[in-house]
Amino acid sequence: MKNEKIVVLYGGDSPEREVSLKSGKAVLDSLISQGYDAVGVDASGKELVAKLLELKPDKCFVALHGEDGENGRVSALLEMLEIKHTSSSMKSSVITMDKMISKEILMHHRMPTPMAKFLTDKLVAEDEISFPAAVKPSSGGSSIATFKVKSIQELKHAYEEASKYGEVMIEQWVTGKEITVAIVNDEVYSSVWIEPQNEFYDYESKYSGKSIYHSPSGLCEQKELEVRQLAKKAYDLLGCSGHARVDFIYDDRGNFYIMEINSSPGMTDNSLSPKSAAAEGVDFDSFVKRIIEQAQ
């Protein structure tokens, strides 16, 4: 309801701070333009609890990305303060933040996802890797420090860079179209096909404004239904709630592979979730409204 006090959480201290600031501003501007009693709070530093206790919001729109918004700490804090919010629970956030844990759960339930394992100094030295492969931090977002490697030399460089962000995983490389689906609780939106500026949808491709987006994706009716069902099943298996996004690769044999689940997706002008909603005829303001009104 519009008489509720809403805090938009954005910023934070993760490597995705700048993207989060843009998401937060877009969401805050939308809420205010729609008549909501909304204020923005930068979650950086150590004063977040004090700010929330002072403001006493009814709901929080979580526009934090990376560890600050997706590792479960903010969800846990909001739940302890009994503040409804737009992201997943602490438990689900912890799981989805760690790509390896998420992948192991999905594989246990026979969901289609590329094979992967943790990458260590020992494994790099053994030189028994099948190329090409993807190397990335196990935790993190926006494809920061994510590499396609085709040789042991590239592998060593990628491992060195990715390890700056924590544990590193190496994943089977799957060639195909990059597809994504946004979800808000029981609402599953249209798939979006991304044609990245670079070889894959890396950090530069995401924020340069040069990638091409097809929304709707152009999948046939049967495949559109299939990818939406897979997205919702993955969302449910990992215990997600509120706003999330499921990313896929769609190969030339007609197979979908779940790449990851993002429990606090971007909400900038260039972000994928608003494009997914727009393909259903839901504009940005309406999408923001749906997300905040379904906060749990």
Curated annotation (Swiss-Prot):
Its EC number is 6.3.2.4. InterPro entries: ATP-grasp (IPR011761), ATP_grasp_subdomain_1 (IPR013815), D-Ala_lig_Van_CS (IPR000291), D_ala_D_ala (IPR005905), Dala_Dala_lig_C (IPR011095), PreATP-grasp_dom_sf (IPR016185). It catalyses: 2 D-alanine + ATP = D-alanyl-D-alanine + ADP + phosphate + H(+). SUPFAM superfamilies: Glutathione synthetase ATP-binding domain-like, PreATP-grasp domain. The keyword ATP-binding applies. Pathway: Cell wall biogenesis; peptidoglycan biosynthesis. Residues 103-293 form the ATP-grasp domain. It is found in: Cytoplasm. Keywords: ATP-binding, Cell shape, Cell wall biogenesis/degradation, Cytoplasm, Ligase, Magnesium, Manganese, Metal-binding, Nucleotide-binding, Peptidoglycan synthesis. GO terms for biological process: cell wall organization; peptidoglycan biosynthetic process; regulation of cell shape. ATP binds at residues 129-180. Cell wall formation. Belongs to the D-alanine--D-alanine ligase family. This is D-alanine--D-alanine ligase. The lineage of its organism: Bacteria, Pseudomonadati, Pseudomonadota, Gammaproteobacteria, Thiotrichales. The gene is ddl.
